């Protein structure tokens, strides 16, 4: 309960709850739309989704500052690959939030001359770049974890006193995929923050992929991905130790 109270008291926490609500509405709307007798429910879900989306804009007005702070932190990373990926990802996120703020100002009627479609496409593009770079960082961290697990497994296999049932070497020719997936599973299992960050970024990237026409998805897939991503974000805000740290 204390963790939940701390969570709701944070701006990021409230934004994650609003985001989860928004994508839940999108997913439910997609599931209910084919049925003709659900028109009223679908309309209510659509209005709630729109209202929650607008409410989230107020929580995100300070995100440009947060993204700049994240850029400063990523520059100090000791490992070269995370430093480059996170710095560029944060810079792209700054541009994305600027575009998002311009779109929000336009929606209030203060800048009606702004080309909505152009700015929306710019926002989607820089959001995509940010997530893509974050995923590259995640994959790099996963590869390091897999190397460590493989090293530990090799040490276990050399020791006759250790139980190697879960770490048997798969036949290189016939079971290489099974061995790789098992190695990936153990790597993510021993590093939950990396698992959450990878899942979150993968689910998030579905939206800009659809908006940019790179990979088209339906609202149900985007809604489900957004909901899963929001739950992962809620966990990292409520339990900071589950957030992937910059080395």
UniProtKB/Swiss-Prot annotation:
Major location category of this protein: membrane
Disulfide-bond pairs as recorded: none
GO CC terms: peroxisomal membrane
Membrane topology: Multi-pass membrane protein
Lumenal side: 106-219
A matching Pfam family: PEX11
Residue ranges crossing the lipid bilayer per the database entry: 84-105, 220-239
Any one of the GO BP annotations: peroxisome fission
Subcellular location: Peroxisome membrane
Superkingdom field: Eukaryota
Cytoplasmic side: 1-83, 240-247
Keywords: Membrane, Peroxisome, Peroxisome biogenesis, Transmembrane, Transmembrane helix
Record InterPro entries: PEX11
Region (Required for homodimerization, interaction with PEX11G, and peroxisomal localization): 220-239
Job of this protein: May be involved in peroxisomal proliferation and may regulate peroxisomes division. May mediate binding of coatomer proteins to the peroxisomal membrane. Promotes membrane protrusion and elongation on the peroxisomal surface.
Sequence similarity: Belongs to the peroxin-11 family.
Quaternary structure annotation from Swiss-Prot or TrEMBL: Homodimer. Heterodimer with PEX11G. Probably interacts with COPB2 and COPA. Interacts with PEX19. Interacts with FIS1.
Name of the protein in its database record: Peroxisomal membrane protein 11A
């Amino acid at each position: 309960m204390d963790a939940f109270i701390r969570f709701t008291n944070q701006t990021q926490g409230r934004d994650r709850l609003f985001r989860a609500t928004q994508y839940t509405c999108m997913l439910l709307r997609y599931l209910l739309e084919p049925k003709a007798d659900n028109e009223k429910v679908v309309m209510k879900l659509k209005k709630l989704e729109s209202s929650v989306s607008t409410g989230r804009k107020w929580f995100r007005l300070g995100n440009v500052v947060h993204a700049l702070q994240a850029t400063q932190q990523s520059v100090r990373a000791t490992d070269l690959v995370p430093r480059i990926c996170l710095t560029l990802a944060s810079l792209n996120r700054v541009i994305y939030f600027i575009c998002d703020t311009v779109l929000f100002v336009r929606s209030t009627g203060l800048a009606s001359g702004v080309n909505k479609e152009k700015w929306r496409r710019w926002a989607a593009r820089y959001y995509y770049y940010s997530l893509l770079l974050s995923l590259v960082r995640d994959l790099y961290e996963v590869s390091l974890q897999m190397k460590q697990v493989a090293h530990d497994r090799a040490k276990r296999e050399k020791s006759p006193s250790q139980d190697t049932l879960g770490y048997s070497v798969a036949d290189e020719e016939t079971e290489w995929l099974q061995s790789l997936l098992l190695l990936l599973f153990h790597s993510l299992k021993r590093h939950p923050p990396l698992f959450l960050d990878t899942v979150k970024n993968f689910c998030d990237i579905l939206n800009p992929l659809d908006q940019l026409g790179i990979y088209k998805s339906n609202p149900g897939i985007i809604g489900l991905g957004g909901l899963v991503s929001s739950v992962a974000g809620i966990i990292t805000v409520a339990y900071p130790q589950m957030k992937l740290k910059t080395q």
